[in-house]
């Protein structure tokens, strides 16, 4: 069975990535992919990590209201949006999930970045 990442790329009309999978969308949205045997994870940095704790708490509260999870990157320099799909997802589910993820990232960038 072909990987979910390759099926998503095919659904988007793109060739499968040969090296580190990365898509750049519209206005500089960079989507990185991490694939395991069980999931396909999409990750997109969308703004610098806030300096004040109240702003950071606000973003963490958003995790309760959306399938898109907000976290910090490994260097603790940026907020990232994360979305996971099971490998058993169909091409349609992967495409719908990708579109939902991009829509959420655009909203986050529009309102907060």
Swiss-Prot record:
<comment type="function">
    <text>Molecular chaperone required for SopB/SigD stabilization and secretion.</text>
</comment>
<dbReference type="Pfam" id="PF07824">
    <property type="entry name" value="Chaperone_III"/>
</dbReference>
<dbReference type="GO" id="GO:0005737">
    <property type="term" value="C:cytoplasm"/>
</dbReference>
<dbReference type="InterPro" id="IPR013095">
    <property type="entry name" value="T3SS_chaperone"/>
</dbReference>
<keyword id="KW-0143">Chaperone</keyword>
<comment type="similarity">
    <text>Belongs to the IpgE/SigE chaperone family.</text>
</comment>
<protein>
    <recommendedName>
        <fullName>Chaperone protein SigE</fullName>
    </recommendedName>
</protein>
<comment type="subunit">
    <text>Homodimer or higher-order oligomers.</text>
</comment>
<keyword id="KW-0963">Cytoplasm</keyword>
<keyword id="KW-0843">Virulence</keyword>
């Amino acid at each position: 069975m072909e990987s979910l990442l390759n099926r998503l790329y095919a659904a988007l009309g793109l060739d499968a990535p040969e090296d580190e999978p990365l898509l750049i969308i519209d206005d500089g949205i960079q989507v990185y992919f991490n694939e395991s045997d069980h999931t396909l994870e999409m990750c997109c940095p969308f703004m610098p990590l806030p300096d004040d704790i109240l702003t950071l708490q606000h973003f963490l509260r958003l995790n309760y209201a959306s399938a898109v999870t907000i976290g910090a990157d490994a260097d603790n320099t940026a907020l990232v949006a994360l979305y996971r799909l099971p490998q058993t997802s169909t091409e349609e589910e992967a495409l719908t999930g990708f579109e939902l993820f991009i829509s959420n990232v655009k909203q986050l960038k529009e309102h907060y970045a």
